Amino acid sequence: AYLKNQLGERQYVPKRAGAISEETRYVLDYFKVEDPELITDVGAQLKDISIRKTAGISSQISLKKAWETMKKLDVVTLPVTNRLGKLEGVIVTKDIATSYMDVYDNRVLSKARTQYKNIAETLDGNIIAGNEHAYFIRGKVVVGASDLGFLSEYIEADDMVILGPQKEVQIRALESNASCIIVGCGFEVDPEVIQMANKKDCVIITTPYDTFSIARLINQSMPIKEFMTREHLVTFDI
């Protein structure tokens, strides 16, 4: 403490965190220095912590957008607030990592009430039919095949179907009352299919990604409200 006081402008006071060892006792006695005062708790206090102010985010944004925001701000935690700025919870990198582990439930997107706009944004795609502000609330996610018989047997009403460019396959999915069709690899969709989708209130999303990439990325479109921490938060005003 004496040396630090000589080297800098700040004031230091000698303290000890436990019993004095024999070696330290010898040095203190030799130089006739009083024993440093004992400190029983060296835990950090709020005044010792550097606080970074981070703007709150909506609970409706996608996991992908939350992750991109974390990387941009170089943080591992984001506060989630409502429209009035009141804290609803926090989302951390662990929460996002956990969401990637739930890959065996093909209805997880509808259970999370995922907005089609989020899905298109996550897939870097465009919504060319249907209401982008609507939500996927029922059904499962299906990777379609070119076999029309398979589609008729496997696709159920309200399902979300990932398809290729085949017009007849897209029409069969619409006839099966799919709620959303995702067309990959940047393929264009026939105007007849778009018109039919609008009549059936079916959303069509086109994306440059291939089928594998779509299936891998699509879960990142879920809203963070399903994964954020809401309880046991210690909060305070500053």
Indicate residue ranges for each PLM-predicted region.
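Short gly/pro/ser/thr-enriched loop/turn and capping motifs at secondary-structure boundaries
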Residues: 21-22, 44-45, 188-194, 211-215
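Bateman/CBS regulatory modules and CBS-like beta-alpha motifs in cytosolic regions of diverse proteins
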Residues: 37-69, 81, 87, 116-129, ...
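Active-site-proximal loop->helix
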Residues: 22-31, 194-199, 218-220
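Long, charge-dense
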Residues: 106, 199-229
